[in-house]
Amino acid sequence: MPRLAAKLLLVPLLAVMLALPAQAECYVDYKAKQDDPLRLAYGVSQVSDAVCGKPKQAKAELAPRLAADGWTLLKILSSFGPEGLSERKESAGDFYLRY
């Protein structure tokens, strides 16, 4: 009987372990600015799954990437999966998955 119980527990455990490597993709859309002259931008970037749905953490991850090119991240607007990419591509223009 203990072997049967162990096998019954092993099946769900294996299912969970196999599912772990398949992580979802996470993206955010944001607003940023550059000074002198003032430029405003709307963009879309990929962020780590760990910050998905957490605007403050996503901002902390994305801000340094933008700052490297002289941009200041103003706001994370939303986070979404790959299904939301196509509807934002045109609006983001040059800032689509740039950072």
What do these predicted regions represent?
Residues 2-99:
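Terminus-proximal functional modules
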